[in-house]
Regions:
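Charged docking surfaces used in two-component/phosphorelay signaling
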Residues: 74, 163-262
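N-terminal Rossmann-like NAD(P) cofactor-binding subdomain of oxidoreductases
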Residues: 1-190, 226, 254-255, 259
């Protein structure tokens, strides 16, 4: 698709925190949209959103939504279950799907893309393109230029993730905690607290969030780099942070590192 050609675009999960950010960025960057279609669950159907000064109504996502509306590009952020069901339906109509969930990230037939890191991998797509976990993106954008020069041997990543990573309800829980209102999203109190668990634990003591960092890093770099990770939820609305310890195969000094990152 050429950037100056207007296309039909769909947002799946338009009522969610990420879906709303999709809409904001499309508007800010003046993306060449011919027709915009907003989809979400039945609960959000009928809600209205303003885009480029026009009012759009959110529709319930249906099996025929993509074929009926001749959608060229669909941005999915409605969770893995929805993506697993509807992304193949959309791609079969000729629509290109960019999926923000974990549904397709580790599928061998689906490229996992960070534009600043592995853009050429997108050429292998068959209709579905996955983007990594937010913390993976944050880490690898910084690590890629270092890996190219010094070759990474081992990485230890500690992430400190804002409640926005848990969606609108995560933000509400933080705000409600200050008012002593019972929270709904987090198992433990998040107000004035750090929770050293994001998602469920496996038998080895890693959470799903931590394993995403391990597996996605190896897939994107196409190498079996040793990675270990810790993920902590912290009581701030936005902005994740990370502390990364890296072991390289090639020799270096700090001046080399700074020069590469600059």
């Amino acid at each position: 698709m050429k950037s100056n050609k207007e296309i039909n675009v769909a947002i799946v999960g338009a009522s969610g925190l990420v879906g709303q950010k999709f809409i904001q960025i499309l508007q800010e960057r003046k993306f060449p949209i011919k027709n915009l279609f907003l989809f979400a669950s039945e609960k959000s159907a009928g809600d209205k959103i303003i885009f480029n000064g026009n009012e759009y109504v959110i529709d319930k996502l249906e099996d025929n939504s993509f074929q009926k509306n001749k959608i060229d590009l669909a941005l999915f952020s409605a969770g893995a279950t929805i993506s697993k069901k509807f992304a193949p339906i959309a791609s079969c109509t000729g629509c290109i799907v960019i999926d923000n969930s974990s549904a397709w990230r580790m599928d061998k037939t689906v490229p996992l893309i960070i534009p600043e890191v592995n853009p050429k991998d997108i050429l292998s797509h068959k209709g579905i393109i996955a983007n990594p976990n937010c913390s993976t993106i944050q880490a690898l954008v910084a690590l890629k230029p270092l890996h190219d020069v010094f070759k990474i041997k081992r990485v230890v990543i500690s992430t400190y993730q804002a409640v926005s990573g848990a969606g609108n309800q995560g933000i509400k829980d933080l705000e409600n905690g200050a008012k002593n209102i019972e929270q709904k999203k987090f198992r433990y109190p998040i107000f004035n607290n750090c929770i050293p668990q994001i998602d469920t634990f496996n038998d080895f003591g890693y959470t799903k969030e931590e394993l995403k960092l391990v597996n996605e890093t190896q897939k994107i770099f196409h190498e079996n780099i040793k990675v270990t990770a810790t993920a902590v939820r912290i009581p701030v609305k936005n902005c994740h942070s990370e502390a990364i310890n890296v072991e390289f195969e090639n020799s270096f000094d700090m001046g080399n590192i700074i020069a590469v990152l600059e």
